[in-house]
């Protein structure tokens, strides 16, 4: 059953790589270029998963309540720090895995420091700090429980909001983008060459995220997609050799790497690229902040931003805007401010 995690990861890695589904870029572009198309795509993926999740619960296929007590202080700090980290690293947790599979050496560095700090925050010297901050919580888990309503009201609201913005974007006049003459035909062209629409990728990601629930639960792991915990588990296993760290999630993240590599290689996008020393140092620092932030917040942009939001936990919906805010702060100091200073000098 653990191998279903590998299959799920391969599919997710392939779709994210071919669809260029970058959550860091999603958050950053909302501020830097005032483009929210990819954020609408993220909402679409959340919505697809949310509808399916509560349907599976309704018919008895899933009998889980994955939300934890809301560790508000750790979530607020962690999500903000994580948002800063993903800009410096050049990709979120999943994005770092799939960019590493494309041959980006900076992402290799970010991935290593992210995995290392995630492990240190769990069972290493910073474990006590993490536990202390996470222990400051309130017994409020899901938004619908807090307000005493059916989760279907929130599903309906999310669906309406998402449908409105999807329709709004699809109603805009399409802009033809210049493209090279296709070298492939048929299925090969569609899979490895044709540019994927973000909303198409989002639906696929939502379906994969939904499928992850019963597949993961069948192995005793009561959660869906998750990146930070499994990434830490790999590091802990390599250090201790203890097989208890190997679970469905570990196979998932390894599958993401494999699927991304397949997508990059087949589409001629794989190339080992060595950045300058400054970029490597920035990537390493970004990975450190990602590991610290995601562990404190109880999840990354996938665990919190895609999965926890789908079942309407307080953790998910509080961490999402804070991750975005952290991304915007980092984007200001690394992109906006340098551009303004350059323009001021030129004038």
Features from the language model and the residues they span:
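Membrane-interfacial helix-loop segments of redox and metal-homeostasis proteins
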Residues: 1-347
């Amino acid at each position: 059953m653990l191998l279903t995690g590998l299959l799920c990861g391969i599919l997710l890695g392939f779709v994210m790589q071919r669809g260029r589904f970058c959550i860091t870029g999603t958050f950053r572009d909302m501020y830097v270029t005032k483009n929210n198309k990819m954020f609408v795509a993220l909402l679409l993926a959340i919505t697809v998963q949310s509808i399916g999740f509560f349907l599976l619960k309704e018919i008895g296929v899933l009998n889980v309540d994955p939300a934890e007590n809301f560790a508000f202080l750790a979530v607020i700090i962690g999500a903000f720090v994580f948002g800063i980290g993903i800009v410096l690293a050049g990709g979120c947790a999943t994005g770092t895995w799939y960019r590493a599979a494309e041959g980006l050496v900076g992402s290799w560095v970010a991935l290593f420091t992210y995995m290392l700090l995630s492990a240190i925050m769990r069972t290493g010297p910073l474990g006590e700090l993490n536990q202390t901050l996470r222990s400051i919580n309130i017994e409020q888990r899901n938004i619908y429980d807090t307000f005493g309503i059916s989760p279907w009201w929130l599903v309906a609201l999310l669906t309406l909001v998402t449908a409105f913005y999807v329709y709004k974007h699809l109603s805009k006049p399409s802009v033809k983008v210049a493209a090279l003459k296709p070298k492939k035909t048929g299925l090969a062209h569609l899979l490895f060459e044709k540019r994927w629409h973000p909303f198409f990728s989002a639906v696929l990601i939502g379906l994969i995220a939904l499928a992850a629930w019963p597949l993961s639960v069948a192995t005793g792991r009561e959660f869906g997609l998750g990146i930070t915990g499994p990434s830490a588990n790999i590091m802990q296993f390599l250090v201790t050799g203890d097989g208890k760290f190997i679970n469905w999630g570990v196979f998932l993240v390894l599958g993401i790497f494999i699927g991304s590599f397949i997508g990059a290689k087949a589409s001629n996008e794989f190339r080992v690229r060595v950045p300058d020393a400054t970029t490597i140092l920035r990537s390493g620092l970004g990975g450190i902040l990602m590991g610290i932030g995601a562990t404190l917040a109880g999840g990354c942009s996938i665990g919190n931003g895609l999965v926890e939001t789908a079942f309407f936990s307080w953790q998910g919906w509080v961490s999402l805007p804070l991750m975005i805010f952290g991304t915007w702060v980092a984007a200001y100091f690394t992109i906006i401010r340098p551009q303004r200073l350059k323009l001021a000098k030129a004038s």
